[in-house]
């Protein structure tokens, strides 16, 4: 019988080794797969998202096309847990690239996550404070002492802080709770919260909520989105980082062309956010400005301001050196290869076009 | 509207022309009048055609009344189907309810057929009951519901409930089993549950529940890491559910917004229970008291020291101490105290837990005096995880199909228990009943709520006897939850 057990033990060890083997298969000169973390998910947890040229790249399969010939698999991981989930996945070696809002990227960097910013992945856009349809509030001041919902840990947290500062208010003037986008919309519909920072359109269509504040022209309320690569991956596979960057900058160019505006809205509608909502949020914006991948003065100033604010609002404990965080060489090479130098307008630190155009 | 204006203008123009010609009507011949009439008719015809063509030229992307009616019909059909299904095909409850359950199915093989049932207390069937060396078994079948009785949307001070049942084999020789009440409690969250990660927590649970002692004893059945539970807490009765009221909470949570990681600096629990285990009234006039404090290192999620927790627990129990014959109670406030210390570290892929247990139990001697048995146990578990199963981000990643990350977790467990280190008492000889179980195993999480566990146990008695021989055991178990 003991012999039997010994053979069982050997079999158990062999089985474990066999089961583990495919998971631990080692990479060679090129990775077997490229894993991209997207800090968002579609309605109801759909693995499709709009808003950015990067997510349009996902919807159009541009990276899959780029790496098809090499047999490199492209894995897109879309996280309903938003920016913090991307950080968690990166901390545990589950993603190589990330698409992030400013706060989670800054907080991640401040807690020791090692990645390099390689291009900007979207900026500007409208900002809404939405209240239940029967709300009597006429201003933020009227909501004092009431409950405001945001998804803490995401870029929305900094946006709320900036907004409150703009109106000389403090977070402690309200009861700020943490809900994801879908929970906060439900709570608005049932009137259980006084306000949320969220898209108003589907709620207004149902007659359950209305806009209290709509800001469409603030250059710093919605800070630029960031696309980064893990330092370890970058060191190992710089040629792959360049190809990923070039493919996505090519995509940013496609996304910035006026002729593709409508098609892009239709692609984004696959996320479950209706086509008409995209139109309402985007029609009055210049696509080139919103999809600019440039790491220009505006990008740097906005991220630096985000660091200062994150510290001021006690969301980070350690400082972040933005200058050493940014690695522009992949973007510059891509712009040169694609002959797109000068295609996107450079913005100064205040968010104004350097060429003087409005 | 635009073409209506055009028609009006055109007709008005034609009539004016007719009127103008009418001023010289006396001079006009019938022939001229007919000509004018013909022109007028042609004008009207042309205008009619213009109107027709403008109707056809309605832009394609403008919904017509028919389109709107069509959409409305679809919507009404959808609403009808929804309400019909809601009424006829949906299980209903008065309150928010989640149905949950867990089942284990097991096979095991032992290389000794003559051991006494000393280890039956840890849920493992004794080997010698029918002189068998192998058996199939269903050690666990649990079915429950949970939800909330009152949902406080504003502050999240919810009133929650849980009710669950587990099956238990009968030991009367029949093929029957019982369905026993397991959890039956309601829980009120005194502090807000939606105030964000930085808010402290505090809740009060009233009813039958697992007790907050150590690590493994307070984990629900479906979350315990190994096939057999640890020996010391099993034999010291710490897996028993108790009826009473227990307060649980934490203070000063450290929050790392990078990964929404929350590490409460201090977690605490205290409570009062009957001490007579589940589904029974109290059996004496003394209540049992319990408490636990755990400290977690306040470090960022990215730190190597994340999820490093140290805890200590106590259970101050009172038991009826009966005489050796079991016919009379010698002391209805006998000691049944338990103490514990635990260490927890989980930084994927590495993980380790250690628990120390000490039990002090009053036992009657043959001369009706009472002595104290001092039991002691150590349980160390080391594991390494291959795969993504335990990352919140990966578990909740957006997906269309039933994809779920797989994980394989080899582990080693060292589990020692000595029922009595003090002077010998009836049923509690000094040291000689001690044994060690070492387990080498692997958990394969191959679906979202299902795992295959394989364990090779080596049981080693400090003192072997005719009915207590060292033995080896191979176990395989599927566990699924829903």
What positions do the PLM features span?
Chain A
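A local structural motif
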Residues: 31-33, 66-79, 94-96, 165-178, ...
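Short helix-initiation/N-cap motifs at beta->coil->alpha
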Residues: 76-88, 101, 172-189
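A ligand-binding cleft/hinge motif common to bilobed small-molecule-binding domains
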Residues: 99-111, 161, 190-211, 302, ...
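Pocket-lining segment of extracytoplasmic ligand-binding domains
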Residues: 176-177, 182-272
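A bilobed periplasmic-binding-protein/Venus flytrap-type ligand-binding module shared by bacterial periplasmic
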Residues: 38-40, 127-137, 223-239
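Conserved C-terminal helix/tail region of periplasmic/extracytoplasmic solute-binding proteins
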Residues: 311-358
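Secondary-structure end/capping motifs
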Residues: 42-44, 237-320
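Short, polar/charged alpha-helical segment
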Residues: 31, 42-74, 110-111, 305
């Amino acid at each position: 019988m003991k012999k039997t057990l010994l053979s069982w033990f050997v079999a158990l060890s062999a089985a474990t080794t066999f089961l583990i083997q495919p998971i631990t298969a080692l990479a060679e000169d090129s990775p077997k797969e490229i894993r991209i973390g997207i800090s968002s998910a579609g309605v109801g947890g759909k693995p499709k998202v709009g808003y950015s040229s990067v997510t349009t790249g996902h919807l159009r399969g541009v990276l899959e096309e780029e790496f098809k010939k090499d047999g490199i698999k492209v894995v897109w991981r879309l996280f309903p847990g938003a920016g913090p989930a991307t950080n968690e996945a990166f901390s545990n070696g589950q993603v190589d690239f990330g698409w992030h809002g400013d706060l989670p990227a800054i907080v991640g960097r401040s807690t020791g996550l090692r990645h390099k910013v390689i291009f900007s992945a979207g900026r500007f856009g409208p900002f809404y404070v939405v209240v239940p349809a029967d709300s009597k509030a006429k201003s933020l001041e009227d909501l004092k002492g009431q409950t405001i919902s945001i998804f803490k840990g995401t870029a929305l947290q900094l946006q709320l802080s900036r907004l409150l500062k703009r109106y000389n208010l403090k977070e402690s003037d309200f009861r700020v709770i943490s809900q994801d986008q879908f929970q906060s919309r439900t709570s608005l519909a049932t009137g259980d919260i006084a306000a949320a920072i969220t898209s108003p359109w589907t709620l207004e269509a149902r007659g359950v909520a209305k806009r209290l504040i709509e800001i469409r022209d603030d250059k710093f309320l919605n800070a630029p989105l960031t696309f980064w690569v893990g330092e370890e991956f970058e060191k190992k596979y710089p040629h792959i980082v360049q190809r990923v960057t070039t493919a996505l900058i090519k995509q940013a160019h496609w996304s910035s062309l006026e002729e593709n505006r409508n098609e892009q809205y239709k692609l984004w509608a696959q996320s479950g956010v209706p086509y008409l909502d995209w139109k309402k949020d985007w029609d009055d914006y210049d696509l080139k400005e919103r999809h600019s991948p440039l790491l220009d003065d505006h990008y740097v100033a906005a991220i630096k301001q985000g660091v200062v604010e994150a510290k001021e609002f006690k969301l980070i404990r350690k400082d972040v050196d933005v200058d050493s965080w940014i690695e522009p060489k992949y973007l510059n090479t891509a712009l040169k290869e694609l002959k797109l130098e000068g295609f996107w307008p450079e913005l100064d630190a205040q968010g104004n076009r350097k060429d003087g155009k409005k | 509207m635009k073409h209506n204006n055009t028609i009006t203008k055109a007709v008005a123009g034609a009539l004016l022309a007719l009127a103008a010609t009418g001023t010289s009507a006396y001079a006009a011949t019938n022939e001229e009048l007919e000509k004018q009439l013909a022109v007028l008719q042609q004008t009207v015809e042309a205008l009619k055609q213009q109107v027709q063509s403008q109707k056809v030229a309605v832009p394609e992307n403008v919904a017509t009344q028919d389109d709107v009616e069509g959409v409305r019909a679809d919507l009404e059909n959808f609403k009808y189907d929804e309400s019909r299904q809601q009424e006829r095909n949906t299980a209903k409850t008065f309150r928010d309810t989640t149905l949950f359950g867990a089942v284990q199915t097991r096979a095991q093989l032992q290389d000794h057929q003559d051991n006494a049932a000393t280890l039956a207390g840890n849920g493992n069937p004794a080997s010698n009951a029918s002189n068998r060396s192998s058996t199939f078994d269903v050690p666990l079948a649990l079915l429950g519901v949970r939800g909330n009785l009152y949902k406080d949307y504003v502050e999240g001070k919810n009133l929650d409930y849980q009710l669950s049942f587990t099956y238990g084999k009968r030991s009367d020789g029949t093929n029957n089993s019982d369905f026993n009440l397991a959890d039956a409690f309601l829980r009120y969250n005194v502090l807000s549950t939606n105030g964000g990660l930085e808010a402290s927590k505090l809740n009060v649970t009233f009813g039958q529940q697992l007790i907050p002692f150590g690590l493994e004893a307070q984990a629900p059945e479906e979350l315990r890491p190994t096939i057999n539970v640890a020996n010391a807490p099993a034999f010291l009765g710490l897996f028993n559910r108790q009826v009473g009221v227990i307060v649980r909470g934490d203070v000063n949570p450290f929050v790392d917004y990078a990964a929404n990681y929350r590490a409460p600096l201090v977690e605490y629990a205290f409570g009062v229970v009957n001490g007579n285990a589940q589904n029974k009234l109290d059996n004496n006039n003394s209540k049992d008291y319990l408490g636990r404090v755990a400290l977690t290192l306040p470090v960022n999620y990215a730190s190597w020291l994340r999820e490093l927790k140290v805890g200590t627990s106590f259970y101050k129990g009172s038991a009826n101490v009966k005489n050796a014959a079991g016919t009379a109670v010698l002391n209805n406030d006998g000691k049944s105290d338990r103490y514990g210390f635990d260490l927890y570290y989980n930084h994927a892929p590495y993980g380790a837990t250690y628990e120390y247990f000490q039990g002090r139990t009053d036992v009657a001697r043959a001369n009706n005096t009472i002595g104290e048995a001092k039991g002691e146990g150590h349980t160390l578990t080391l594991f390494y995880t291959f795969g993504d199963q335990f990352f919140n981000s990966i578990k909740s990643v957006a997906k269309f199909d039933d994809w779920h990350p797989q994980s394989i977790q080899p582990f080693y467990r060292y589990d020692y228990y000595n029922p009595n280190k003090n002077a010998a008492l009836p049923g509690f000889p000094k040291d000689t009943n001690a044994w060690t179980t070492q387990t080498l195993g692997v958990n394969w999480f191959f679906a979202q709520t299902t795992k295959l566990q394989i364990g090779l146990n080596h049981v080693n008695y400090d003192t072997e006897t005719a009915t207590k021989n060292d033995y080896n055991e191979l176990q395989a178990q599927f566990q699924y939850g829903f």
